[in-house]
């Protein structure tokens, strides 16, 4: 998994590239907790995410809860339908 970040107006766009699985879920959670120091409004761009397992999905829910607790907002964009 790679993570790229881009500031767009008052939002921070975070792009997940590759696979979000149990192997990297903690890395994703840590990255997003650190990102809270840079903003409160996030767009999670999943256009380049190839796969997410249940642990990765749980990490996204964890991140959503932390952002909400901090008074922020998280939107998910470009979710790809895969057969």
What residues fall within each predicted segment?
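Short beta-strand/loop segment at the start of cytosolic alpha/beta domains
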Residues: 1-15
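Amphipathic alpha-helical interaction surfaces in cytosolic regulatory modules
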Residues: 20-83
């Amino acid at each position: 998994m790679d993570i790229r970040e881009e500031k767009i107006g008052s939002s921070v766009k975070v792009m997940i590239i590759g696979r979000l699985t149990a192997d990297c879920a903690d890395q994703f959670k840590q990255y997003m907790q650190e990102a809270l120091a840079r903003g409160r409004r996030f767009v999670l761009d999943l256009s380049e995410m190839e796969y997410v397992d249940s642990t990765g999905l749980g990490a996204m829910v964890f991140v959503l809860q932390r952002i909400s607790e901090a008074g922020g907002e998280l939107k998910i964009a470009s979710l790809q339908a895969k057969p």
